[in-house]
């Protein structure tokens, strides 16, 4: 289940740079537990899928999982050993821009211990530092 947009307005985009903390997608809105990024990174569709598979295997059909990031930015690359010039390379894969504080996954319907184990396992599949977070219950 590779994540990629069905259609895009522009086939190629500029790389840009990731500045600052996340101002959106930084609250636990759906589940009870979350995996939060601590570093800026361009997260690929394959990395999201690897973490999702690891999470689902750990929770074993229990609970509900939300994927809060989507790779909507094309990452283009020129082939190896090609001289400079000749235009921008072809889009290779899709990336999601992840800022520090961005929630990547949310989980509900499982106990805290299992959720923490599953999120830690999913975080180990990702190439940047993450932490486990839980929803604060308002009494």
Curated annotation (Swiss-Prot):
Keywords: Ribonucleoprotein, Ribosomal protein, RNA-binding, rRNA-binding, tRNA-binding. GO terms for molecular function: rRNA binding; structural constituent of ribosome; tRNA binding. InterPro entries: Ribosomal_uL16, Ribosomal_uL16_bact-type, Ribosomal_uL16_CS, Ribosomal_uL16_dom, Ribosomal_uL16_sf. One of its GO terms (biological process) is translation. PROSITE patterns: RIBOSOMAL_L16_1, RIBOSOMAL_L16_2. The keyword Acetylation does not apply. Pfam families: Ribosomal_L16. It comes from the Bacteria. GO terms for cellular component: cytosolic large ribosomal subunit. Part of the 50S ribosomal subunit. Belongs to the universal ribosomal protein uL16 family. Binds 23S rRNA and is also seen to make contacts with the A and possibly P site tRNAs. This is Large ribosomal subunit protein uL16.
């Amino acid at each position: 289940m590779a994540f990629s947009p069905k259609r895009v307005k522009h086939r190629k985009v500029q790389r840009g740079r990731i500045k600052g903390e996340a101002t959106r997608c930084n609250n636990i809105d759906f589940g009870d537990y979350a995996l939060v990024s601590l570093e800026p990174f361009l997260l690929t569709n394959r990395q999201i899928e690897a973490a999702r598979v690891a999470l689902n295997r750990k929770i074993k059909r229990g609970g509900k999982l939300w994927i809060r990031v989507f790779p909507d930015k094309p990452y283009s690359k020129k082939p190896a050993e090609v001289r400079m010039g000749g235009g921008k390379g072809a889009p290779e894969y899709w990336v999601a821009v992840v800022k520090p504080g961005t929630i990547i996954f949310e989980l509900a319907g499982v106990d805290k211990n299992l959720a923490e184990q599953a999120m830690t396992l999913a975080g180990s599949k990702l190439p940047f530092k993450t932490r486990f977070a839980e929803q604060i219950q308002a009494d």
